[in-house]
């Protein structure tokens, strides 16, 4: 052990090309340097030991944020200023949300082959548990432990979304989750609420239950503004359908990782959920939901075509941005269509309630991971950036470090901290109850403050079990989405769709059990 430690101490990381490093002993390094000097006429020496004059390059891949000011802050303020302060050249590439899984899969294959992946760190938007063997689980653990020491607990939602209890390893670090309330047109909802009576009555101030959405949705569809909940092979569909399943008291697995959706008593609950979604589609929606993309919620709602969507607050924020632009153009807030639209774009206080409770998910789950084959200087830079990014939630910390306004304000409260005390509840609510974005739009200044309740109702993908490699594959191969869509379209009966999906899910779980990454027995 002592000899091994001495060997490691004698080694140094050497950059051999852009993004490529090699670990050499001091003796090997000096030999290479001498050889390069002897062949000086052949060109410059390639092997260069890292010095302060030659900063580490840290390559990050992440999504194009649905609140554009966040990318402006991260790319033009946080990353360059953090890099300057820490002697790191930070290169950020932003791509569409749907592009990330394919890029990550390609890079994972390169890591497995011992090659440079192309990026050093990637931000995923669902728990990337299938990549556990290609990522630096020790680095992730070190980041999480340091953040716990600095700011306190890592919320259970994040723990279940990044930690594998079977291997006892962290396959990622979650810096944020994005609450997923129901957005609805308050003006249209009030009209419907006034019209419905008796057992069809719905609350005046928006839906509380899934049945409220079904009842009101029938009228909203007749008015030309149907419900817009995707039934396609994309992330938002996967999230809201699981929220509904969990609210019906069923799901893919139990806490131990056993597949349960077709096992009594869960089988009947799953069938009931399938029948409900079929009725919800037929009575309240339109065929376009079968071609939904991650942008459709925003596009269809903001165009005025749909009246209800399950979405992060980016819908409300975009409506407010359009309203603020109208006010800057000189429009009267009390007459401006854009301002009125923003004022009538509301969110529910909680996830809709089903027979078993009000259980929601997150719209996206922000999880960063570092590839396992990154050299020590890059690894250390990635760890420090993640720690400082989480600490920047606090606007006072961000201002002191030189990258204001910080993560929470830059995202306009879209990114909610998984280290809950990175920004105190008092500071979160101070922002949300006197919201500068809402005020600039002529909107009610505290309208989005209810998003704080998401800590009480947001659940992880795969609840009540962990977000395992099997859950990751089931989610990203859209097995649940297809099951519900085939029933809604009348292609399969609920029983046929459930049996087919359960068989697929069991094969996925068995594959990952055989690799030692998933628990459970059936």
Spans of model-derived segments:
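N-terminal secretory signal peptides
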Residues: 1-24, 28
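C-terminal lobe and pocket-closing loops
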Residues: 314-325, 332-340, 355-479, 516-522
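Early extracytoplasmic/lumenal segment of secretory-pathway proteins
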Residues: 55-59, 64-128, 295, 299
């Amino acid at each position: 052990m002592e000899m091994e430690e001495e060997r490691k101490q004698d080694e140094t990381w050497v950059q051999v090309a852009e993004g490529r490093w090699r670990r050499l002993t001091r003796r090997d390094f000096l030999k290479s340097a001498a050889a390069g000097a002897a062949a000086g006429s052949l060109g410059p020496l390639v092997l260069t030991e890292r010095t302060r004059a030659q900063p580490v390059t840290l390559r990050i891949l992440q999504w194009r944020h649905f609140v554009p000011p966040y990318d402006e802050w991260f790319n033009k303020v946080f990353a360059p200023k953090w890099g300057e302060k820490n002697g790191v050249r930070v290169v950020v590439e932003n791509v569409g949300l749907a592009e990330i899984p394919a890029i990550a899969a390609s890079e994972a294959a390169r890591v497995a082959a011992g090659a440079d992946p192309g990026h050093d760190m990637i931000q995923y938007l669902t728990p990337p548990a299938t990549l556990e063997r290609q990522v630096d689980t020790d680095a992730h653990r070190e980041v999480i432990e340091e953040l716990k020491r600095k700011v306190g607990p890592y919320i259970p939602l994040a723990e279940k979304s990044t930690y594998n209890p079977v291997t006892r390893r962290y396959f990622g670090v979650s810096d944020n989750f994005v609450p997923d309330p129901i957005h609805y047109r308050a003006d249209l909802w009030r009209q419907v609420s006034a019209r419905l009576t008796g057992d069809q009555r719905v609350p005046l101030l928006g839906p509380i239950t899934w049945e409220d959405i079904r009842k009101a949705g029938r009228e909203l569809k007749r008015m030309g503004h149907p419900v817009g909940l995707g039934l396609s092979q994309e992330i938002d569909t996967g999230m809201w359908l699981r929220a509904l399943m969990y609210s019906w008291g069923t799901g893919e697995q139990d806490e131990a990782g056993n597949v349960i959706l077709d096992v009594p008593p869960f089988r009947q609950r799953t069938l009931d959920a399938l029948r409900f979604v079929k009725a919800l589609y037929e009575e309240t929606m339109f065929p376009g939901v079968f071609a939904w993309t991650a942008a459709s919620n925003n596009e269809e709602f903001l165009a005025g075509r749909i009246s209800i969507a399950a979405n992060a607050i980016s819908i409300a924020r975009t409506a407010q941005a359009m309203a603020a632009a109208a006010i800057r153009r000189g429009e009267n807030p009390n007459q401006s269509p854009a301002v009125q639209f923003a004022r009538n774009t509301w969110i529910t206080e909680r996830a809709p309630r089903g027979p078993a409770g009000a259980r929601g998910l997150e719209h996206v789950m922000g999880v960063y991971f570092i590839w396992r084959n990154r050299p020590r200087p890059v690894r250390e830079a990635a760890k420090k950036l993640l720690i400082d990014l989480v600490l920047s939630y606090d606007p006072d910390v961000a201002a002191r470090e030189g990258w204001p306004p910080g993560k929470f304000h830059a995202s306009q409260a879209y990114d909610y901290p998984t280290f809950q005390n990175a920004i105190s509840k008092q500071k979160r609510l101070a922002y949300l109850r006197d919201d500068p974005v809402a005020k600039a739009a002529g909107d009610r200044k505290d309208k989005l403050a209810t998003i704080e309740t998401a800590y009480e109702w947001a659940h992880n993908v795969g609840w009540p079990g962990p977000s395992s490699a099997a859950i990751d594959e089931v989610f990203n191969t859209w097995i649940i989405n297809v099951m519900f869509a085939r029933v809604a379209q009348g292609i399969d009966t609920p029983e046929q769709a459930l049996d087919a999906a359960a068989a697929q899910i069991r094969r996925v779980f068995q594959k990952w059990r055989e690799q030692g990454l998933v628990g459970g027995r059936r």
